[in-house]
């Protein structure tokens, strides 16, 4: 009797009932949609921005960082940190997930035969490095993210750095990276689903509750397009306190800093400091839909006072995963110089949500 009690305690984790829901099998769908539709149209713009600011950049750290989340997830049980559903189930799910990822990614690479940006081979789509990194990040999140949110944040941070490295090294197009991330996430979820079949137990849940009271570092990356046709790469880092606002959703507040790198050679990089507010709606306890509003001040190049600008935006996001969200943003910037061409702009992209603390 005592042995059974110990086994149950080690094999399960108490699940709170006051959390919003996430849809893991559907979480990768926006990435696949972007990779198939919007991203191919932006591939050349992303490459042009990369070639303008980092033309000679060559790094090799992404060859090693890609394995960090998977290696950590596999080694933690040996260090005495029990995964969410026990060691046997843990390694079964990982074995299936790795096998599915290998077959799926390698098969797609040679079936599609897309040429790399460097032109040296025809196995660009999808990115294998990115798939490996996001496979490990999702497995780490599934096994330990419930109890150790910092581990989940570490996994997705290193996976995102790997994706960045593949683009900065001119090894992949943007759509390759998005498809690789989706392949890794879906492979991890499929591995857990197959482990359920092997062990004849229902442990992997399609709809899973997630903490919505947290200190969140929100790192958004996306392509910006103005209505006059210019393209830019936008990056913003926001620190938010996100708290449940009741049964219907969440609210939050914080600050952010951002930068934009333009494709145009005559346009200087710009930056901004903003006050950010966030509100989210729980849509049928399946996924969250929210807005992110910002107002702030920024500058351009080396003369921020002469070219200071005030602006704001409203972002509409869809989040089916606790570690990242998809967003669509529309905004306007105002500037003292009335001759400046500052029309409305729109952005679309992905934001990584790193939970520093959760409760």
Predicted regions, residues:
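Gram-negative (and chloroplast) outer-membrane scaffold detector with strong preference
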Residues: 80-85, 89-92, 111-115, 238-326, ...
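Sec-dependent signal peptide cleavage junction
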Residues: 1-21, 199-214, 358-359
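Outer-membrane beta-barrel "beta-signal"
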Residues: 211-213, 217, 235-237, 343-359
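Alpha-helical transmembrane segments that form the membrane-embedded catalytic/substrate-binding core
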Residues: 126-136, 172-195
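Hydrophobic alpha-helical bundle signature of multipass membrane enzymes
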Residues: 4-124, 130-166
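Outer-envelope beta-barrel architecture signal
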Residues: 150, 207-217, 231, 247-253, ...
């Amino acid at each position: 009797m005592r042995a059974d009690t110990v086994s149950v305690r080690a094999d399960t984790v108490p699940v709170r009932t006051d959390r919003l829901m996430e849809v893991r099998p559907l979480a990768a769908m926006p990435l696949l949609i972007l990779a198939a539709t919007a991203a191919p149209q932006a591939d050349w713009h992303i490459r042009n921005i990369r070639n303008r600011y980092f033309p000679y950049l060559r790094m090799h750290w992404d060859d090693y960082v890609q394995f960090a989340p998977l290696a950590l997830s596999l080694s933690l049980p040996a260090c005495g940190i029990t995964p969410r559903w026990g060691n046997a189930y843990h390694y079964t799910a990982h074995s299936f997930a790795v096998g599915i990822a290998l077959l799926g990614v390698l098969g797609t690479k040679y079936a599609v035969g897309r040429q790399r940006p460097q032109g040296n081979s025809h196995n660009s789509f999808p990115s294998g490095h990115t798939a490996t990194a996001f496979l490990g990040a999702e497995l780490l999140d599934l096994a330990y993210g419930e109890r150790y949110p910092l581990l989940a944040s570490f996994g997705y941070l290193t996976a995102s750095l790997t994706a960045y490295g593949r683009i900065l090294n001119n090894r992949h197009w943007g759509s390759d990276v998005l498809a690789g991330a989706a392949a890794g996430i879906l492979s991890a979820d499929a591995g857990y689903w197959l482990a359920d079949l092997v062990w004849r137990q229902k442990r992997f849940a399609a709809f899973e509750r997630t903490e919505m009271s947290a200190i969140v570092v929100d790192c958004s990356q996306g392509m910006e397009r103005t209505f006059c046709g210019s393209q830019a790469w936008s990056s913003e880092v926001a620190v938010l306190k996100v708290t449940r606002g009741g049964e219907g959703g969440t609210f939050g507040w914080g600050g952010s800093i951002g930068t934009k790198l333009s494709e145009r050679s005559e346009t200087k990089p710009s930056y901004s400091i903003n006050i950010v507010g966030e509100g989210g709606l729980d849509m049928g306890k399946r996924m969250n839909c929210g807005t992110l509003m910002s107002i702030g001040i920024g500058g351009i190049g080396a003369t921020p006072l002469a070219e200071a600008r005030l602006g704001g935006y409203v972002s509409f996001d869809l989040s089916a995963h606790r570690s990242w969200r998809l967003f669509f943003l529309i905004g306007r910037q105002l500037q003292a110089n009335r001759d400046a061409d500052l029309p409305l702009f729109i952005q679309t992209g992905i934001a990584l949500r790193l939970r520093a603390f959760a409760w």
